[in-house]
């Protein structure tokens, strides 16, 4: 709404928008709670952000469908004047749970079948290489792609700015709509819940022993 966008602008928020490329790509999997396509509504939201001068970036999931069209995917973001882009490859396993969940948690990810929408290693590699070859020609310094920027930062001995490429993780907790806080936005499962903002502070939860133990999973020599 205009009211929310005014709030974001006044308080210097950076808003992340989940959008998976042009309409035919986005609507393949991004449905609303009624099972309807969501692209039109997402673009309406982006236009509202632009109207109020709110800074925003795109968080784009790369799946089995859109990964085969890397340049169409990348050029779309340039067309809508998006200069900050995060690509997130989706790889999930399916495991049924009594509470209705169907995605496998970290401890279960070897038990279930790979979800049909998962991007393959070959697709993901080709996707990145194709976009990089286009980006490096004339877009460096104008369009910022997180995985490329973070890779360069690591190469130069700088902090990469993204936890998955950093030496240590554990600073990217996530809060759900009801105040529940989890160790990481990639692991919103019951076993990684830290607490709730209504009963504990973020500082307490993010510096808790539970969060410390989660960080150790990342620094462990185990390939997991």
Predicted feature descriptions by range:
Residues 190-204:
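A short, polar/charged loop-to-alpha-helix boundary motif
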Residues 28-40, 47, 51-164, 168, ...:
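Radical SAM enzyme [4Fe-4S]-AdoMet core and its adjacent flexible, acidic
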Residues 176:
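Short, acidic, Ser/Thr-enriched surface-loop or helix-capping motifs
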Residues 218-223:
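Conserved small/polar residues in nucleotide/adenosyl-binding loops
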Residues 1-11, 23, 47, 51:
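Conserved Radical SAM active-site core
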Residues 12-23, 84-90:
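Non-cysteine beta-strand/loop elements that form the S-adenosyl-L-methionine
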């Amino acid at each position: 709404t205009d009211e929310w966008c005014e709030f974001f602008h006044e308080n210097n928020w950076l808003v992340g928008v989940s959008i998976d490329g042009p309409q035919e790509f986005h609507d393949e999997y991004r449905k609303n709670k009624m099972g309807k396509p969501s692209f039109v509504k997402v673009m309406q939201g982006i236009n509202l952000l632009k109207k109020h001068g709110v800074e925003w970036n795109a968080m784009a999931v790369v799946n089995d469908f859109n990964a085969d069209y890397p340049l169409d995917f990348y050029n779309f973001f340039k067309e809508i004047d998006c200069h900050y882009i995060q690509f997130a490859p989706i790889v999930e396993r399916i495991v049924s749970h009594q509470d209705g969940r169907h995605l496998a948690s970290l401890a279960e990810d070897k038990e279930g079948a790979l979800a049909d929408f998962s991007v393959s290693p070959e697709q993901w590699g080709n996707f990145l290489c194709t976009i990089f070859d286009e980006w490096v020609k004339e877009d460096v310094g104008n369009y910022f792609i997180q995985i490329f920027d973070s890779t360069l930062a690591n190469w130069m001995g700088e902090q990469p700015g993204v936890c998955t490429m950093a030496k240590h993780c554990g600073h990217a907790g996530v809060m759900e709509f009801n105040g529940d806080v989890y160790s990481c936005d990639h692991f919103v499962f019951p076993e990684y819940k830290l607490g709730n903002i209504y009963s504990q502070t973020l500082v307490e939860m993010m510096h808790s022993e539970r969060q410390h133990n989660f960080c150790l999973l990342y620094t462990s020599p185990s390939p997991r």
